[in-house]
Amino acid sequence: MDFLAQPNLPDLINYGLVAPRIKVLYIPTTKVACSTLKLLISQAEGAYNAQAAQEIITPNISQEQTIHNYRVHGLTRLFDLPRKEQWEVIESSEWMRVAALRDPLKRAYSSWENRILLRAPGTPQSILEMCGDVFVDGRVDVAATFKKFAQAIHHDRVAFAIDDHFRPQFNTLYANQLEYHHRIYIDRPGEMQTLADAINERAGTSVKLQRLNSGLGIKADQIFDKETADLIADTYHEDYEWFGFERHNFTAPSTSLVLNPIQQALL
């Protein structure tokens, strides 16, 4: 495939993270193991600041979430580099460019669970208002509430694009313009470790992968019926077209997952 970088590509991916010592560019995608990969690259670079992590923990920011703070991960943000250096990072054969992908249905559910169901700080109010909870006997039906989200984002994807958790992965990676040396699929066994090995070899380190920010443990087959899965797959059709994800095989005409009283109280 030929990669045709447009003049504004550095602006489109200016959230990319640069590890200058080991010459790695990482383009993070929300809800695609980005906490784990930021920590891996930060530690391999020797930039991780554990003291800063302790200083910024609050009731709304857990230890695991601190890795998203630039003081903690210590990596250079692409937008902080001069234009000439940005293009060197993007095009030079001396640099390793990496990214990760995730099954669109699993990513959509994970984003919704975190941003909408659990009301993560910073979630736009306009999105929360479009996705109110569905209750059964005073308790949230997670499957029905997620279906409501699937219908809303399918109807008006632009309204959700103000939050990068809900944008297609293609619109984050710009894979037709930027050549990646490692573009892993985190749902495929072993691919995360393969990337970790490549980064450790490059850095001369032995950093271990750490799984961070896991969700509520709800499985896809508890949530997706055929209609919901079709809506999400159509909403993120670019990701299927560009990255070759397998189509879903959910066939149930409906599904329901009502929280028990203890779960409802915790929510």
Language-model segments: which ranges?
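Membrane-interface amphipathic segments in extracytoplasmic regions
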Residues: 1-267
